[in-house]
Every structure is written in C-alpha cells, then in structure tokens.
C-alpha cells in the first residue's frame, strides 16, 4: 500500500544525523530525493536527526548544510530539527497507549539481560518476549520505572512493495514490540522518524537499504496510528573498488573533502553520484536539467555500486573544461595568491583570468589548475625543479640565448608572432621546434609542463618573459 503520486504532491526528505560530515553516501541519498521531488514538481525537505545529544554537534550540522548548499540541493521550507519535536513524539506514544496499541513494560535491565543470555544459549533470535504485553500495570512495584512499547502484530506477515528492491515480506512473528518511549520519557529514533515523516507529509521515503529492516517496524507503528503509508525505496549502499562497504580506507568520505582536498567541482560530484546506482541508457554526462527530467526510481539498480575515483576524476576534467573562466579564476585565486605569498591586486586577477582558457584544458581539478597557474606569479629568479634544471645545461642555454634574441626582436608580442620567431631559431639550427621550446619552458616556468609555450610568453608579457630568460642566462 502506498501514496498515489497522481492524487497528491510528492514530498521527499533527507534526514541525516549530525554526528559527522555529510558523507558521500548521504549526499547521493539527498540527490536522489531532491531529483525525485523536482521531477514530480513536489517538495524536498531537510530534517536533522539530532536526538543523539551526546554525539550531535553544531559543527556537524553546519558541515551538512554547507555540503548541501555546495551541491546545490536546496530544500523547501525551514530545516526540521528532530530533538525540538520530542514532546510531539511522546504525545503519539501516549496516544498509542490510550488506544491499546502500546503498553507499559516494567522489565528491569537485569531481567532483559538474563533473557538475552537464555536466548543466546538456546540459539534463538535476540528479541523482547512481550512479558508485559498483556499484564496489568498494577502488578508492577509502585513507582517502578517503565518504557512504553508498541503492541505489534504477532501473526500474519507484512509486505513492503519497495520501489527498488521489489516486494519484500517479513513474518510479523519476527518483529518484537519495539520501545517507543524510554524510561526517562525520551522518544526513540524509530518513533521520532515515523512521527516526523507523517507530520511533514512525506509521501516517498528514499534511503539506504541498511534501513530496510527498520521499515517493517515503522510500518507497524504507522498502521497502529491509522496513518497513510509512504512509498518506500531502499537504495543499495556504495562500495569501494574492492567490493567492501565504502569506508575511510577507500579515501575521502566527506563531501567537504571532495571540494577542499580533491578540488572537485560540485556539478561533477553530482553527475558522478547520479550515475552511481542509476542509469539512463549509455548517457554519462548528464546536466542538472536532464537529471530532473529523466530521474525515476525504476532506473535505480538493486546491486551496490563501486566507487571509482578515476572515473570521478575524468568526469571532473570534463566539467573543468566546460566551466566559466571567471568562476574558475575566483576558485583558485586564494590558493594561487597563497603560493605566491602575497595579496592579489586587480592586475593579478586580470592575468589569472586571462590564463584560465590555456590552463583548464589540461587540469583535472582545481588543485591542478592552481598549481598550473602559479608560475605566472613566482618571484624571480625562479626556483627550478630537477627536470627543468637539467634542460638548462650548456647546449640548452645556447639555444635559450638564440631564442631570447629572436623574441627581443619581435615587435608584435602575440602567440602567433612569437612562434614565428622561435621557429626561425629551430630552422637555422636544423632541429625540431620542441628542442628550443623545452629550455624556453624551463626558464619561463621553472617546470617542464605548462600551457603552450607561446601562450606562456603572451601571458607573461615582454618585460617579464625577457627578464626570466636573462635570469637563467646570467
């Protein structure tokens, strides 16, 4: 049984716990929920499940919101904080108690520990045996602490027609009477989730398949309250390249690390996560507009997807080449300025912006782009890396001197005119253009890789270029 998309507005939610960063699996869950809601013209809600007060931190909440904004996964309405709704959760538990769908359980921790030991010894499943299910509360000692448990069905079965996993059936006898309110009056996670989803009008619960077992217990609670059941879609988890569940040993986990440490663009991460478990034919490069138009739950596979950093890196390279030059310049300016050890002025920004078209064609990420641009702002005389220094031996310097002479005689300081001057040196010596370009690149950048050497000359300008050559010629 599920909500009908035709009759009501689709409402999805992303409900992370703020006990750490927004991890990559959570980001994909958020993306799928966001796309499904947008595809159906519905609402996408954000709920912070901060009921674990010992582990929930404001820093983690900020990291989650920051990650969501970076991925451009805007939510509708205000953020819902679960802990603030504790009284509403308790109210529902009391309502269930009043209508006979819940009961007070006075079993002590010692009794429950003994029960578990007996079940272990008998090799039985560890579950509460319902000892207070039909007992009169007056049998308990006066003032004894109690929890409130759901009186779950004990016979029959429950089937979830999962939109990803297909129909999944569990015998009710396998489900125990879960705790709704603890002895201190605080609601459990299972109660809070169900109440919040109902009150927020959530029609589709799209989440990791590690929550599938929870769904059967949650459904028992929904039915006890007589509430409309959501449509469930439990998506497979993300695995590392070795097939094990994605963990720290596989590399970056937090969305912030993909941005700050790996230097990836948000659109590349979104595109990669979309294709990680969902497909649309052979399409690999999928725009945000196409994703909204095409996304459906039928395209989500049942098998775990393997995270491939190389594929993500290549995808990011594509988006780097497509990205707006001014945006890229703004993204790398702080890093390039830090490398240069100074504040950038408008002239520096202008030079950086002019360099982007030449640099972005070979950069796979923001870090590579920043490193590629740093030669423009290095202090003279340049530090040479080992390979560059080896190109400036005596034969290399002899070619450099000839190139310097040809460049100094060039009136039009444009890439085309500069190439003609350097090419004439190569032709006179009966050597390839690369033989002259190699020591020239080393002297101008201190490295052996850079944009095209004539683009480098044009970007640096006459005075800076000739000055750098003179530094190496002594």
From Swiss-Prot:
Q: Which UniProt keywords apply?
A: Aminoacyl-tRNA synthetase, ATP-binding, Cytoplasm, Ligase, Nucleotide-binding, Protein biosynthesis
Q: Which GO terms describe its molecular function?
A: ATP binding; glutamate-tRNA ligase activity; tRNA binding; zinc ion binding
* InterPro entries linked: aa-tRNA-synth_I_cd-bd, aa-tRNA-synth_I_codon-bd_sub2, aa-tRNA-synth_I_CS, aa_tRNA-synth_I_cd-bd_sf, Glu-tRNA-ligase_bac/mito, Glu/Gln-tRNA-synth, Glu/Gln-tRNA-synth_Ib_cat-dom, GluQ/Sye
| CDD domains in the record | GluRS_core
A Gene Ontology BP annotation from the UniProt entry: glutamyl-tRNA aminoacylation
Residues binding ATP are 248
The Gene Ontology CC terms held by the record are: cytosol
Q: Give the motif span ('KMSKS' region).
A: 245-249
Chief place of localization: cytoplasm
Q: Where is this motif: 'HIGH' region?
A: 16-26
Quickly give the catalysed reaction: tRNA(Glu) + L-glutamate + ATP = L-glutamyl-tRNA(Glu) + AMP + diphosphate
**Compartment annotation:** Cytoplasm
- As recorded in UniProt, its EC number(s) are 6.1.1.17
Q: Please give the NCBIfam families that the UniProt record associates with this protein.
A: gltX_bact (TIGR00464)
Q: What does this protein do?
A: Catalyzes the attachment of glutamate to tRNA(Glu) in a two-step reaction: glutamate is first activated by ATP to form Glu-AMP and then transferred to the acceptor end of tRNA(Glu).
Write out the similarity annotation. Answer: Belongs to the class-I aminoacyl-tRNA synthetase family. Glutamate--tRNA ligase type 1 subfamily.
The UniProt subunit note reads as follows: Monomer.
Put simply, this protein is called Glutamate--tRNA ligase 2
Q: Which organism is it from?
A: Rhizorhabdus wittichii (strain DSM 6014 / CCUG 31198 / JCM 15750 / NBRC 105917 / EY 4224 / RW1)
